[in-house]
Structures are given as structure tokens and as C-alpha cells.
């Protein structure tokens, strides 16, 4: 692929988000979603492997079906304006169809099955884009839908996704599938954050991107598709093992790591709104998902001790690069951020 084509697709994906965010009509939302999808498909097959082609076809089929439901829901809602007494009913049906279409595009439970299969067939780089940036257009639409009468349904989707993401990753040894279920769990928190307020949702999404992109980059460099392959690669990269282990603990939201701060923000909001049931379900899903985060971190930090390192370098005398040092310090800032936010005036 020409080096000039990739920036074109990236700019198109950014423009799709701007189109959705600046418009309040379902037609422009639909156009923005499809513009981002079509621009992302060439990035999926960047390395031209058969697995990537298969994953791209699955992704296209799901997105096309969801787009058709979205457009049909918009037409149903529009037809209600010309049908007198059933206006409200048709409008509600149309809004529900639009919401279900966006939920399917995002991969929220129970419409999450395609996410795991697609991510498993992708390289880590397009997989990272799929699980981070490609969520932005759908979340922008859901943020606008949350102002309607669909907030309770979105809360339900978010809670179910948090639980499914935790339970689905328990028996996984494939790193891509594990990251896919992790994304589903975090997506549940993101949707709940969008219902709570766009600023809370944006804050949580920013934290998730900051934490997940370095993990995808390290796994891409190590080319670790399986836990056993990851262990072999980490035996020659002791500093990577520390960074990866701490990164997974932070992604799981374990205090005092950076990922704990995002979950704390949402939980304090819902406890303040007396939505204790939502808080309990989200915490339960996080505690379940912490099991596989701890398993990977245990493999990286504890199992691969200094005596097992085969890099030929001294474990204790090796120096961290500036990037690694920054990421390690950032991951340890969770409790400091919580303490600072607690001191702010209410």
C-alpha cells in the first residue's frame, strides 16, 4: 500500500468522528459511521495475510448488517412523523433499532461475538485501532442517544458487557482473545460513563487508550500470540516483562495503578446518584476480569525471575529507557490522582 494512502484513511476516520459529533440528525450520524468503517477496512488488511482477510470479511458483514438496521430505524422514526396518533410509538421503535445497531457495531454484549473472532485474526496494530479509535464514532452516537429515554437500556448493556468481558476471558490463553474480552469489559464501563455524562466517558476512554496502546505495542514487538510464546519472548526482554506486567495490572484497575483512577471516577458518580446496583455489577465484572490480568502479570513479573532471564544482561543493573520509565511512573499514579481529586471542591 502506498505510504500516501494510510494518512488519507486516517484523516477520513477523524473526519467521520467530527461529522457525528457536530450533527444531531440520524442521517449524518449514519454517514459518519459508514465513512469511518469504509476508511478502516483497508487498514485491517495492511499485511495481506489470509487470517486478516477472513477477519475483514467478518467485520464488513457485521458492520453492513448493523448499518442497514440503523438506516431502517431512522426511516421508521421518520415515518412516525406522518402517521398521526402512532407518532410516539414509531419514534420509540426507530430509536430502539438505531440503538441496537450502534450496540452491534461497538460489540457490546450480547452482540459481542464478532469482536473476539475479528481481533484474533488481526495483527496487533489494526487490532489496537479496532479496540480503541473505532469505538469513538459509536460512543459519540450513544452519548446523544443517552439523552433520550434509552439511558436505562444503555446501562443494562454496559453492565452485561462488564460481566461478559470478565467471564469470557477467564479460560483464554490467546493474547488477542484475552485483549478482546478485556475491551468488551472496558466498553461496558465506557457506555456507563457516556450515560453518566460525556465528560466522564471521555475521561475513561482517554485513560483506556493511554493504558492499552503501550500493551499492544509491546505485544506486537514480542510477537506473542499465546501465553507460552509470550513467556519465551519475555525471557530475552526482562524490562519488557516488568512493563507488561505492570501495564496489565493497571489495565485491570488494581490500585494503586493508573487504571484505578478511571473506575474510581465512575463509581463515585454512581454512588452519589444512589445507583448502587450499577456499581455492584461493574465492580463484580472488574473483580472477575482481574483474574486473567493477574495471571498474565504473574507470568511476567513473578515466574520470569532474574535466574530465568536469558538476555545475558544483569537484571538489576539494566537501565530503563525514558519511555519505559515514564510508563512505569504513570501506571503508579492512581492513588495520587484519587487523593488529588478528593481534595477538589464538590
From Swiss-Prot:
Q: Which Pfam families match?
A: Proton_antipo_M
Specify whether Cell wall biogenesis/degradation is a keyword of the entry: no
List keywords of the entry alphabetically: Electron transport, Membrane, Mitochondrion, Mitochondrion inner membrane, NAD, Respiratory chain, Translocase, Transmembrane, Transmembrane helix, Transport, Ubiquinone
Determine if Transcription is one of this entry's keywords.
no
Instruction: Tell me where the transmembrane regions lie.
Output: 1-21, 26-46, 60-80, 96-116, 122-142, 151-171, 178-198, 199-219, 242-262, 274-294, 320-340
Which locations, inside or outside the cell, does it occupy? Answer: Mitochondrion inner membrane
Q: How does it sit in the membrane?
A: Multi-pass membrane protein
A single Gene Ontology biological process assigned to it is:
mitochondrial electron transport, NADH to ubiquinone
Q: What is its main location?
A: mitochondrion
Q: Which GO cellular component terms are attached?
A: mitochondrial inner membrane
Q: Which InterPro entries match?
A: Complex_I_Subunit_2, NADH_UbQ_OxRdtase_chain2, ND/Mrp_TM
| A GO molecular-function descriptor | NADH dehydrogenase (ubiquinone) activity
Give the EC number(s) under which this enzyme is classified: 7.1.1.2
Q: Which domain of life is it from?
A: Eukaryota
UniProt catalytic activity = a ubiquinone + NADH + 5 H(+)(in) = a ubiquinol + NAD(+) + 4 H(+)(out)
- Summarize the protein's role: Core subunit of the mitochondrial membrane respiratory chain NADH dehydrogenase (Complex I) that is believed to belong to the minimal assembly required for catalysis. Complex I functions in the transfer of electrons from NADH to the respiratory chain. The immediate electron acceptor for the enzyme is believed to be ubiquinone.
Family as reported in the entry's similarity comment? Belongs to the complex I subunit 2 family.
- Name-wise, this protein is NADH-ubiquinone oxidoreductase chain 2
Amino acid at each position: 500500500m502506498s505510504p500516501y494512502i494510510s494518512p488519507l484513511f486516517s484523516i477520513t476516520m477523524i473526519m467521520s468522528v467530527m461529522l457525528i459529533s457536530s450533527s444531531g440528525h440520524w442521517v449524518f450520524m449514519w454517514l459518519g459511521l459508514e465513512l469511518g468503517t469504509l476508511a478502516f477496512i483497508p487498514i485491517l488488511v495492511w499485511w495481506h495475510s489470509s487470517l486478516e482477510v477472513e477477519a475483514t470479511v467478518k467485520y464488513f458483514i457485521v458492520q453492513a448488517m448493523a448499518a442497514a438496521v440503523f438506516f431502517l430505524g431512522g426511516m421508521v422514526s421518520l415515518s412516525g412523523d406522518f402517521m398521526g396518533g402512532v407518532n410516539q410509538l414509531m419514534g420509540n421503535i426507530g430509536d430502539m433499532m438505531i440503538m441496537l445497531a450502534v450496540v452491534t457495531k461497538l460489540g457490546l454484549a450480547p452482540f459481542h461475538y464478532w469482536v473476539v473472532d475479528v481481533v484474533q485474526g488481526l495483527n496487533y496494530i489494526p487490532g489496537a485501532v479496532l479496540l480503541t479509535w473505532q469505538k469513538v464514532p459509536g460512543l459519540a452516537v450513544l452519548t446523544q442517544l443517552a439523552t433520550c429515554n434509552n439511558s436505562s437500556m444503555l446501562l443494562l448493556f454496559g453492565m452485561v458487557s462488564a460481566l461478559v468481558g470478565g467471564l469470557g476471558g477467564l479460560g483464554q490463553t490467546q493474547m488477542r482473545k484475552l485483549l478482546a474480552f478485556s475491551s468488551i469489559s472496558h466498553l461496558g464501563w465506557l457506555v456507563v460513563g457516556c450515560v453518566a455524562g460525556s465528560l466522564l466517558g471521555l475521561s475513561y476512554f482517554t485513560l483506556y487508550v493511554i493504558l492499552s496502546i503501550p500493551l499492544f505495542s509491546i505485544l506486537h514487538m514480542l510477537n506473542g500470540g499465546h501465553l507460552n510464546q509470550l513467556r519465551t519472548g519475555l525471557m530475552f526482554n526482562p524490562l519488557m516483562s516488568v512493563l507488561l506486567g505492570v501495564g496489565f495490572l493497571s489495565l485491570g484497575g488494581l490500585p494503586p495503578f493508573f487504571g484505578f483512577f478511571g473506575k474510581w471516577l465512575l463509581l463515585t458518580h454512581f454512588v452519589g446518584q444512589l445507583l448502587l446496583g450499577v456499581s455492584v455489577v461493574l465492580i463484580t465484572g472488574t473483580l472477575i476480569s482481574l483474574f486473567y490480568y493477574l495471571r498474565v502479570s504473574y507470568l511476567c513479573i513473578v515466574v520470569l525471575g532474574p535466574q530465568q532471564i536469558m538476555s545475558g544482561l544483569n537484571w538489576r543493573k539494566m537501565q530503563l529507557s525514558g519511555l519505559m520509565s515514564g510508563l512505569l511512573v504513570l501506571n503508579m499514579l492512581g492513588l495520587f490522582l484519587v487523593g488529588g481529586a478528593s481534595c477538589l471542591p464538590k
